[in-house]
From Swiss-Prot:
GO terms for biological process: Mo-molybdopterin cofactor biosynthetic process. S-adenosyl-L-methionine binds at Y39, G80, S131, M202. This is GTP 3',8-cyclase. Its cofactor is [4Fe-4S] cluster. Monomer and homodimer. The keyword Metal-binding applies. [4Fe-4S] cluster 1 binds at C33, C37, C40. It comes from Haemophilus influenzae (strain ATCC 51907 / DSM 11121 / KW20 / Rd). The lineage of its organism: Bacteria, Pseudomonadati, Pseudomonadota, Gammaproteobacteria, Pasteurellales.
Length: 337
């Protein structure tokens, strides 16, 4: 575990040595997932014996309050599959009530959406990202290991019915698996306010051979979009890393997340906390800085914020994926992607 000094630095804002400001926290609330996606957990979730439990509701609330006081405006609940937690609604309601948090998002595999999305909206979830790696039910089953395509599609429709104006859909781009569905995805968003986001496959410790076989640069899709009249949009300060393209003839949008692109890290605006309370400065970085010992009471907030600020001063300018350094991450389910 990395050791970080805890000198109290007062109400420090979340700014790193390269003057990047961090308004966005990705908070994993569980490692558990009920899907078996080929690029993430092909063998399914394997619980580790004698390991710490996931953060409690109280600990999550203390954490979110500390980040909000330091300037965080957006929190995304991730996993694993975050909606597997029985107290998911309580977690959402607690974070929604924190001053300064303007957006509360969730990334989900969508298996519970048709049933529960109305409750998510009531609890304060402002935006939803759903994973849909194929519009072909058979390919969806092959990639996810689960025969739930129709359920996920019903969930997306239900999200619009309960009042969400836009739904973001994530698809991990994989050569010779779903890359040939690009035109089908375009047709799908023609009349639907969906931001369809293609995420370039990322190398992790356990998935080197998979990466070598299936990686495809997102630039291939960017070139197609620009050639066919799509326009790159400007980002707001809380937006994620996606390059978003729009077209006057389409209700939906296309987003591309390309971590191997030059200067990808220059606009970094997010930090990550794992489901067991470790701060991660980069998806492909160190093993994490322990925060959980400072999440036990509100009186610890000042020291907690000082530790977060001190840790941020050690953030690297960029990742080293381009030279094959994936950090210590074996798979993305352990940190929420």
């Amino acid at each position: 575990m990395q050791s970080i000094p805890i000198k109290n630095v007062g109400e420090s804002r979340l700014v790193d040595p390269f003057q990047r400001q961090y308004y966005y926290l990705r908070l994993s609330i569980t490692d558990q997932c009920n899907f078996r996606c080929t690029y993430c957990l092909p063998d399914g979730y394997q619980p580790e014996a004698n390991k710490p439990s996931f953060l409690t509701l109280k600990e999550i609330t203390h954490l979110a309050q500390a980040f909000a006081e330091m300037g965080t405006e957006k929190i995304r609940l991730t996993g694993g599959e975050p909606t597997l937690r029985k107290d998911f609604i309580s977690i959402a309601e607690s974070i929604t009530n924190i001053d300064g948090i303007r957006q509360l998002a969730v990334t989900t595999n969508g298996y519970r959406m048709a049933k529960d999305v109305a409750d998510w909206k009531k609890a304060g979830i402002t935006s939803i990202n759903v994973s849909v790696d194929s519009l072909d039910p058979k390919m969806f089953h092959q990639i996810t290991g689960i025969n739930k395509f129709d359920d996920v599609m019903r969930g997306i429709d239900r999200a619009f019915e309960v009042g969400y104006n836009k739904v973001k859909v994530n698809s991990v781009l994989m050569k010779n698996l779903n890359d040939k569905e690009f035109e089908q995805f375009l047709a799908w968003v023609k009349d639907r306010p969906i931001q369809m986001r293609f995420i370039e496959l990322m190398q992790t410790g356990e998935m080197d051979s998979f990466f070598d076989k299936f990686h495809l640069s997102g630039q291939v899709l960017a070139d197609k979009l620009l050639k066919n009249g799509w326009t790159l949009q400007h980002k707001s300060h809380t937006d994620g890393p996606a390059k978003v393209f729009t077209h006057p003839d389409y209700a939906g949008e296309i987003g591309l997340i390309m971590p191997y692109e030059k200067n990808f890290c220059a606009s970094c605006n997010r930090l990550r906390v794992s489901a067991k309370g470790k701060l991660h400065l980069c998806l492909f970085g160190e093993e994490g800085i322990e925060l959980r010992d400072l999440l036990q009471s509100h009186e610890q907030q000042g020291i907690l914020q000082a530790r977060i600020f001190a840790a941020l001063q050690g953030k690297r300018e960029h990742h080293y994926l381009h030279i094959g350094d994936t950090g210590v991450r074996n798979h993305l389910a352990s940190i929420g992607g």
